[in-house]
Amino acid sequence: MAAIKALQEWCRQQCEGYRDVSITNMTTSFRDGLAFCAILHRHRPDLINFSALRKENIYENNKLAFQVAEEQLGIPALLDAEDMVALKVPDRLSILTYVSQYYNYFHGRSPIGGMAGIKRPSSDSTEELSGKKGLSQPAKLPSPAQTQRSPLSPARTNPVVQRNEGGSQRPSPKAAPGTAGSSVSSICGVCGKHVHLVQRHLADGRLYHRSCFRCKQCSSTLHSGAYRATGEPGVFVCTHHSSEVTSVSPKSSNLASRKPGGVTADTRPFGVSWTVQEANGEGTPLRVRTAAWEHAGGNTTAKGFVQTELKPPSTSQVHVGSSAGPKLPTITVTTTSVTSKALTHVTNSSPIGWSSPAQSSPANFNSRPVVSPSARNTHLPGSQGQTASKGVKTQLNLNSESSNTAVTPAWTSSASKTQQAREKFFQTPPSAPAPASAPAPAPTSKVPTVVTVPTSKVPNVVTAPTSKVPTVVTVPTSKVPTVVSAPTSKVPTVVSAPTSKVPTVVNSTNSRVTTVVNAPTSKVPTVVSATNGRVPTVVTAHTGRVPAVMNTSASKVSPVVDAPAQESSREQALSVLRKALPALTGSGTQAPNRSFPATSSVLVTLPKNEVPQKVPSDKLSALTTQTPNFTIKLEPSAPVNVGNTAVFLQAGKKSPSISPRVGKTSVGSRPQAEVAGVKGPGPISQEGQEEGPEGWRARLKPVDKKTPAGRSLEQKEPVLAEPRIGDTSRKASSSSDSSVHITLTSIQHKRKPCPAGSGPSPAALSPSPSHRKKLAVPPSLDVSADWLQPEPKKQEDGTRSCKEEKSPTRWSRERSAVLDSGLAPPGEAVTSPVRLHPDYIPQEELQRQLQDIESQLDALELRGVELEKRLRAAEGDASEDSLMVDWFRLIHEKQLLLRLESELMYKSKDQRLEEQQLDLQGELRRLMDKPEGLKSPQDRQREQELLSQYVNTVNDRSDIVDFLDEDRLREQEEDQMLENMIQNLGLQRKKSKSFLSKIWSSKSKSGQA
């Protein structure tokens, strides 16, 4: 009896001096609840106003004590206020176990429930407590129809005993017939069986076996802080299902609720963090995360395809199918015509993020308007509602006569007029049927985006099989080859990116298919057209910039493509162009008789390790982004270097060549008349002495003369990735009289430190003709989109490499700097720096440890049930004291397991929150780096949303640290206190080893450093 006597003596000392409180035993002395309130008031007088309590208010006193202990101290309520009223003699073992938790807490030890309860915010203090004592109805269990209080934050705690009085009077149970020592509310809310003390789990006012308290969806045992209530009473679900922990990348992030109007799928896996959102995340944000994560918090990646169907001019549907799971809901967008202003948004998210330097480049397009069944292996990240800024948006305009799968028509008012002018320009002569009609042209500066499509890391072979099927354009942002073929399509497809300054045009009329592609960071337009005599070849320019012209065929990708052109077609197209673009024709920089040749071919040499007929366009376009400092001149068939590439250009007898210039960037040349309003005109073919290199050198316009504002705008343009291609050489030749020869030689391996402002050395820029191979280039290839790049700000650190000094600001570089990790080599997936941390625990390992704890708890409960039966049978015997010590030890072991489980859950949450924070930080920096004058209202709104999510994520992480610190203060002396108690009882027991979790120790040390 020593253990019980010792605990009883401790209670007597704590309650000494309090009115109406006398501790003479461990049963009836606690029935009125004043003893519990007295113990709490002695240690925490701020929590209870003891002077207002009355001895006769049994229900109110017990309810107040249980509620305060649970919500403020984290001590789970093993007792119920109704039981204390209904039973003349309360259950002795229950009171002993419950009071022992008071003892443990106020002696620096965690309560039996672990850490979860401490994190719970205080509940409403306006509950009606009066009117209970005078009622005489018998005790009864809470019914499912009872009004339930709104669920508590799952990221903070386990919901426990909480009843919403709602202003109504709930009858207080009076003494009911029953055996002494039994508990009225001891029936599990799921299985209906008796719940032993060691098995008790209270949630939302109902009692459960811990093993019965499982997720309705995945049937996993619900863990502290990782579940949430549903609308159905007594039903809970995981905020983060264990099956999704190992398969879903937290970067998908969680981020919740991207741009308004975006198509989002809410599956909510990241409940504990990033959403735990958290999204993660937190309901994700961690936004997304991704899939919001997630999903409400995270993002899932499913293999599927995007298919848009063109309905009669009323509605259009976007189907997002998944072969790995159920299809997402169909989104219907109402449209009125092929030039409708309705927008169809398909948002995307990538499990590896958009900042991967090895997978994206400024000239890449994630456009996959129509994908045939053969291309269904394309990855379609399933949608956290990621912001449209993370993907290249594409507008698609289709003729309504398409009978098969067609792209949804969606044009904004600012884009429709420009596109109509382009359609008119690209239509066949009057003798041939025009695929679409276009009203009067009207130039515009930018083309809005409508559809975003995901990043693909697998080969994409896209075909448009039969006639009247729109052209298929796929240009993934990965380094995987892409083959584009459109044999007999009669419907024009226009693809444009929102941030492009000038268009890159691909006109393929051999099959009467018109494709227009705008590169997002293109400065000089490139027109690639292939004609068979039915369509004119005309130079087109956006905002007055001068294009270079190359010809190829969209019907077939071959090493050499040649087709004759007709003079009448050229004249007709030029007349249309002059009407649509008066700034270009008015400047006098291009005459009808001097238009570029209509028949030419393109052949590009790719690295020797590439496979023919499959050209990764991101590598080609990425070559031009390394060193943007160069000047432009004209030489006949003269090879010169462009940044880190050597280029041969020949068009008839006029060949513009591009060579690097130290410390300068000439974005254009000035012939007899400069293009009005254009800061960076491209090279124009001129006759006479202007053809020589001397004439062009004399007319070079240094970049230093540009206004600071103009330079700043160009520098601010984001480049999503930094290409890495070494020892590649590209050469183009033609079988026609007028051809374009292109040789691209990378000098990436020559990267070395150099002083600020200096240019690349001649040795570093020399071409390497020994590594050249001839490969076909797809018609959608943009070989000159990034020849001209803005001059970056000079670096103060002179030891930086030339490439870093000349590259514009990149989100991936900023993020890498923040994460203290280098860029991944080509072809490798980008690993989050959080995962590289020495104390990072993979989700698989976390789940394994949680399963181990689950098994130990199950075994512990079996022991506890047997020990409880022995204790009840031995009440008053000499063996009771020994059994009670064993009982306290068992409760302590359970306490340690629950604490370890809680730490693992918080560890998982913190890791997801950290990844979510990094994602938010990268996107937020990119938006904040954008000049205020260029920010749209959506950008400003998105910036505020990200800022709010970022602050919430940081606060959540800070809360986790605070909670852990509070618990550690009590846990430090826990084992010693238990040993001291046993020794005071006169029992010689071997000290048990503590298996406290050490998963936070390394992180704490690194944080202090």
From Swiss-Prot:
Chain ranges of the Calponin-homology (CH) domain: 1-107
Keyword Coiled coil annotated: yes
SMART domains, sorted: CH, DUF3585, LIM
Tissues/organs with expression: Detected in brain, lung, liver and kidney (at protein level).
Residue ranges constituting the LIM zinc-binding domain according to the UniProt record: 186-248
Region (Mediates targeting to the cell plasma membrane): 261-805
Modified residues (Phosphoserine): S110, S143, S153, S249, S766, S768, S832
Membrane topology summary: Peripheral membrane protein
PROSITE patterns named in the record: BMERB, CH, LIM_DOMAIN_1, LIM_DOMAIN_2
Main location (coarse class): membrane
Chain segments carrying region Mediates interaction with RAB13 and is required for transition from the closed to the open conformation: 913-1009
Boundaries of every bMERB domain copy: 833-980
Subcellular location per the Swiss-Prot or TrEMBL entry: Cell membrane; Cell junction, Tight junction; Recycling endosome; Cell projection, Neuron projection
Keywords from the UniProt entry: Cell junction, Cell membrane, Cell projection, Coiled coil, Cytoplasm, Cytoskeleton, Endosome, LIM domain, Membrane, Metal-binding, Phosphoprotein, Tight junction, Zinc
Biased composition, class Polar residues, residue ranges: 144-171, 348-419
Subunit structure, interactors included: Interacts with RAB13 (GTP-bound form); competes with RAB8A and is involved in tight junctions assembly. Interacts with RAB8A; competes with RAB13 and is involved in E-cadherin endocytic recycling. Interacts with RAB8B. Interacts (preferentially in opened conformation) with ACTN1 and ACTN4; stimulated by RAB13 activation. Interacts (via calponin-homology (CH) domain) with the filamins FLNA, FLNB and FLNC (via actin-binding domain).
Domain notes: Exists in a closed and an open conformation due to interaction of the C-terminal coiled-coil domain with an N-terminal region including the calponin-homology (CH) and the LIM zinc-binding domain. The conformational change is regulated by RAB13 and RAB8A. Adopts its closed form upon interaction with RAB8A and interaction with RAB13 causes conformational change from closed to open.
Listed name of the protein: MICAL-like protein 2
